[in-house]
A protein has these predicted regions:
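Charged, glycine-rich active-site and insertion segments that engage polyanionic ligands
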Residues: 1-54, 72-75, 144-147, 153-332
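Clamp-loader machinery-focused feature within the broader ASCE/P-loop NTPase space
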Residues: 1-130
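Conserved amphipathic alpha-helical interaction elements at protein-protein interfaces in regulatory
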Residues: 57, 110, 140-141, 329
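Conserved adenine-binding aromatic site and its adjacent loop/helix in ATP-hydrolyzing domains
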Residues: 106, 137, 160, 164
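Alpha-helix capping at helix-to-loop junctions
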Residues: 110-114, 129, 141-144, 168, ...
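Short, surface-exposed loop and linker segments with low hydrophobicity and enrichment for Pro/Ser/Thr
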Residues: 127, 136-140, 246-249
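Conserved catalytic/switch belt of AAA+ P-loop NTPases
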Residues: 133-150
Length: 332
């Protein structure tokens, strides 16, 4: 399963929630339904995977970390274990359909070789309404030994009936000093760590990817170039066209963060960490040009654009909507 680094690299902000879950499991009090929430890149999958490895490890006991050497640990590390099923969309951005949930329900109902059978749904907010209804029946009457772990960065998209059947385990972003201390193990350059922290919007695993994976760094640089273009009245249209080369799930949250930075600059004269990633003169001109009211309107629109990111809205229409909003939002 993904995000399963060696335990020496297990994110420290996940230790406490992991330990609490393991203690409950050892005491026979682990809920049959868990909803792990938190921002994308905070470590939900890492928490889930380490929890399952600890519970299935043939050597670990109490709150000891998984050994990483037994057959169960090796199987989970390789992404295959007979008692664990990972349910994901067939393609990123697609829905999880009802037939997939029915197969998962059948998996949970089969007797296995151990006491634990786990279904991990990643991300749970990809369930369509029929799939969610099929899952609800299992959450209401789970088979003996079954544990369902739902992960979601957008839990509000889940039906209330699903959320109410799960115990919520929320993972907040760690404080910036703790995050940057952890990131320092991957890049000793403090300025690079600060840039990755800002670019990731404080999401730890996303920040690590920016530091260690050239493709993620290139994606951030591409997004920054697009956003910088939106700040320039003469470059809005080319920047909007360039959005087609970017991923909405990374660009739109950064667009929202940029507008928050601009509002902060307009109201306090201060530049926050994300805003400091852009030319100061361009930010200042953008703030003067749109004024507090125009910035507030753009920020409200940005929330809507981000909500639309998981919908089948034509990217061309979104691009045009953003361009028109930036061109027409001027007002003091």
């Amino acid at each position: 399963m993904s995000e399963t680094a060696a335990d020496s690299g297990f994110p420290p902000w996940l230790e406490d929630p992991w330990r609490r879950l393991v203690e409950r499991a050892r005491a026979g009090r682990l809920p049959s339904g868990l909803l792990v929430t938190g921002a994308s890149g905070v470590g939900k999958a890492a928490l889930t995977d380490r929890l399952l490895r600890a519970l299935l490890c043939q050597r670990a006991s109490g709150t000891e970390p998984p050994c990483g050497e037994c057959n169960a640990c090796r199987s989970l590390g390789g992404g295959v274990h007979p008692e664990v099923l990972l349910l994901q969309p067939e393609e990123p951005g697609k829905e999880i359909v009802v037939d997939a949930v029915r197969e998962a329900n059948e998996f949970l109902s089969l007797s296995g070789s151990g006491d634990l059978r786990a279904l991990v749904i990643r991300p749970a907010d990809a369930l369509n309404i029929n799939a969610a209804n099929a899952l609800l029946k299992t959450l209401e009457e789970p088979p003996a030994g079954a544990v369902l772990i739902l992960e979601s960065s957008r839990p509000a998209r889940l039906p209330a009936t699903i959320r109410s059947r799960c115990q919520i385990v929320d993972i907040p972003n760690p404080p910036v000093p703790a995050l940057q201390a952890w990131l320092g193990a991957f890049a000793p350059d403090a300025s690079a760590v600060a840039e990755a922290t800002a670019a990731s919007l404080g999401r730890p695993l996303a920040a690590r990817e920016i530091l260690t994976d050239p493709e993620h760094m290139e994606a951030w640089q591409r997004d920054r170039e697009i956003l910088s273009g939106l700040l320039d009245a003469q470059a809005v249209l080319p920047a909007a066209v360039a959005m087609q080369r970017s991923l909405p799930e990374t660009l739109l949250p950064r667009l929202q963060a940029l507008l928050v930075s601009a509002q902060r600059l307009a109201l306090t004269g201060e530049t926050d960490a994300f805003g400091s990633q852009f030319p100061a003169d361009r930010m200042a001109r953008f703030v003067r040009r749109h004024g507090p009211r125009g910035l507030a309107r753009l920020a409200a629109r940005a929330i809507g654009w981000q909500r639309q990111a998981g919908t089948p809205l034509n990217p061309q229409l979104r691009m045009e909507d953003i361009a028109l909003a930036f061109i027409g939002a001027r007002s003091g």
